[in-house]
Amino acid sequence: MHRMEQRLEIEQFICRSDNYGVLIHDPESALTATIDAPDAYAIEAALERRGWTLDFIFTTHHHLDHVEGNEPLKEKFGVSIIGPEAEKAKIPGIDRTVKGGDEFTFGLFKVKVISTPGHTAGGISYYLPDAKVVFTGDTLFALGCGRLFEGTPATMFHSLEKLVALPGDTALYCGHEYTQNNARFALTIDPDNSALKERAKEIARLRAHERMTLPSTIALEMATNPFLRWHDRTIRARLGLQDAPDEAVFAEIRKRKDMF
C-alpha cells in the first residue's frame, strides 16, 4: 500500500481531570505510540480496548502531567521514549532526543519535529504530513495557547507562526480539554466573529454531554482562535493596536487571557 493511502489510527481519551491521552497506531507495522504519558493506567486501558501494545512515547514537554506515566509504561512495555533535546534532563526514562527540523519514521509515516517553545523552554510538536495531523502538546490549544511558564510572548508567537504555516486541513490534537473556557475568553476578544459564535455553541453542546471537542484543524483555529488572529483588523481595533506589530497584538491577547 502506498504511504499516502495508509491510514493512521488515533485513539483519544480524557485522563487525569482534563488531560488528553492520545494513542496513534500504524496498522501496517502494528506500531503504537502515545503522545505524552499523562496517566499510565488510562493509557493501558485504552491499549486494551484497541488490542494494541505500546512501542513509543513521543514527549512534547517535561511537565509532570505529560510525563508521569513514562517510567511505569517503560517498565511494563519496554517502550522507547522520544523527547526534546533541550529538556532531556527533565524527562523520565528518555531514550532518544530530537529537536526542531529532525525527522524520523513511525511505521510507514514520516514524523517531523517542530520546535515550539513558549509554554516550556524546549517544547516540541510532532507533525505527520502523510496523516495530515499535528500533536502540539500545550503550545496550541483549541481556541487557545499555552501559558508562558518558561518563555516570552515573542517565543510563543514564533512557535505559533510555525504551526499556522501547516496546511489548513491538518488535524490538531493538543494536551488538554480547555476548549469551553477558551471559547468564553475568545468571545471577549472577537465577539462579532460569526464562525467563533457558532463554534462556541457547538462546544457547549459537546461539553454538556461530556464529549470531546478535539480534534480541530489548523484552518478552524485560524478562523476562530484569537491567539492566531493577530492580523485581524477588528481585533486590533478592539485592543487599540491598529498599527502594532503582529507580535504585540498576540502579547496583549495573552496578557488578557492570563487575567481572565
Curated annotation (Swiss-Prot):
UniProt keyword terms in alphabetical order: Hydrolase, Metal-binding, Zinc
Annotated binding of Zn(2+) 2, by residue: D65, H66, D138, H176
Co-factor binding details: Binds 2 Zn(2+) ions per subunit.
Domain of life, source organism: Bacteria
CC cofactor: Zn(2+)
Positions contributing to Zn(2+) 1 binding: H61, H63, H119, D138
Keyword Nucleus (UniProt): no
Enzyme Commission number(s) of this protein: 3.1.2.6
Enzyme class (EC, first level): hydrolase
SMART domains assigned to the protein according to its UniProt record, in alphabetical order: Lactamase_B
Biological pathway: Secondary metabolite metabolism; methylglyoxal degradation; (R)-lactate from methylglyoxal: step 2/2
Any one GO molecular-function label of the UniProt entry: metal ion binding
Family designation: Belongs to the metallo-beta-lactamase superfamily. Glyoxalase II family.
Subunit structure: Monomer.
Name the UniProt record assigns to this protein: Hydroxyacylglutathione hydrolase
Species the sequence originates in: Brucella canis (strain ATCC 23365 / NCTC 10854 / RM-666)
